[in-house]
Amino acid sequence: LSSSSAASDVYKRQAICIYNPLNHDEVIKKSKKNSKKIFTNKKQLKILNIGRFTEQKDQLTLLKALNLIKKDISFQAIIIGRGKLRNDLIEYINKNKLNDCIKIIDFVENPFPLLKQTELFILSSRYEGLPNVLLEALSLKKFIISSNCPTGPKEILLNGNGGLLFKVGDYKQLAKKISYYQNNKNKCKKLLNHSIQNIKRFDYKTNMQKYLFLIKKFI
């Protein structure tokens, strides 16, 4: 080839995207195991976040957004995880009198029964690789609001056609997205169905077939 750019174009045309595999059936199976009820009021909006308490996961942005909507929306939010910023999050909750609507739960080995109970999953990360937790939430048919962080959420949520995206760190925009979901559940259900229909591309069976194709190609 006469140039590196030409070579690059050839490589792009021949490239195959293989995702970190999701075992959809295993998520469903684990979600059916017995677990205590974490959401006690059926009438409240049920919100869940799962992740380490670090700068990367940025749960503080989520807390700030929830603080903005607390007067307008009745909700119960559960944040599951552990990490060095746990005390900072608890301090913010106490300072803003959010104890009645936000609970922090320590890391659990099997979070899927808890994920199954929620209505809305929120990812507030500043950056990710491919956030498997979003795929797991979709496996259990949960609507997602996610930061538009690098990388993964935009692709998983079909550029906003399969869920709602907000700017990284923008808690005011996140608050608006939560309010939009609460007031437009029928529209959001259509977005969710769109994502669910496209989740097969992340399934381990689909990606194993791609691996087998590559192996056979070079044997």
Regions found by a protein language model. Give the residues of each.
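A short, well-ordered alpha-helix in the C-terminal region of glycosyltransferases
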Residues: 173, 180, 187-201, 210-213
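Single conserved hydrophobic/aromatic residue that forms the stacking wall/gate
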Residues: 1-7, 11
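A short helix/loop element that forms part of the nucleotide-sugar donor recognition site in Leloir-type
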Residues: 27-42, 46
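A conserved nucleotide-sugar
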Residues: 41-46, 53, 59-104, 187-188
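Carbohydrate-associated surface elements
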Residues: 21
